[in-house]
Amino acid sequence: MPAVFPELFGASCIHKRPEPIMKASDLPYPCSLVFNAGVIKYKGEYVMIFRNDYGTDKERFEKEGRDFTGTSIGIARSKNGVDGWRFDPLPIIDSNDPNKDPELRRYYDPRIIEIEGRLYLCLAMATQHGICGAIAELSEDLKSCRLISHSVPDNRNMVLFPEKIGGEFVRLERPMPVYSRGRDRFDIWLSRSPDLVYWGRNSFLLGVEDVPWANDKIGPTASPIKTEKGWLTLFHAVDRDDETRGKNGWEKKWTKRYTAGMMLLDLEDPSKIVSLYKEPLLVPDMPVETDEGFRENVIFPCAMLLEDSGEVKIYYGASDTCVCLATAQLGDLLALFE
């Protein structure tokens, strides 16, 4: 694979809103960056659960090397899933909570899904001894959550399918085998569980080498959507080593580019790929994604919703800085596999 890729283009059926739908200044509590947000439709409105890094700004980060002092998980609601977001007054999880387990450093990159009437979160979980993927249950009133299970290190980017398949919960995940794969060549795996606690029947699903525009790592993004042709599934893909990148962002040495691809998985056995779209679906191409923010050239979806109209909403973090929204018609997305 080439070390540096040429310019990439997203699918023409994708329509991006030109401005972020959520930014740091919108929050009612300290926030430097708000991004990587899970979204569901719940009790007649849209519920977003988002990552918030806080405690510094661009000037202090660049001049003083001051890193972020904390990460929290917050909740907001909207009638249309686009604007008018109403924020809970405080985060539901905060890394500076004095009562948290001392082994835990922080939770981040949340996804949210409803399965059989219960709300579940998938979270990245940084501990003193490695990074884990975690699953928690969120209360019906969205006020509290409890940890159900977490993986051993190192693992991340877990997403749950929105229903049981063959009587089992199913998740996608991205282990990080630094020694065996080399550098960041991390791939997507699938696991099953009877109860969200004990996970097994693990199977390899998609490798970096299967994605023509990736040379670094890939990983799950949002919970899949069930369609007549299979489970519509997004993934992120990373290419790196372009030294021209990162010059306008906070992190000047950032040379990676995050894009999104898609595949169809078998409805009855999602460990089988029905079809893989061989081009990027989403690429960073707007100024908010390429020329500003914490890390340039990053788009990172964490939610995908299918509306009754056939519109698919894709919520994604841009430049690790804000939340953006892209839309497409389901029929147009499925046609890309033909």
Give the label of every model feature segment:
Residues 108, 158, 222, 300-302:
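Structural signature of WD-repeat beta-propeller blades
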Residues 1-105, 113-159, 163-216, 225-294, ...:
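Beta-rich carbohydrate-recognition and catalytic domains
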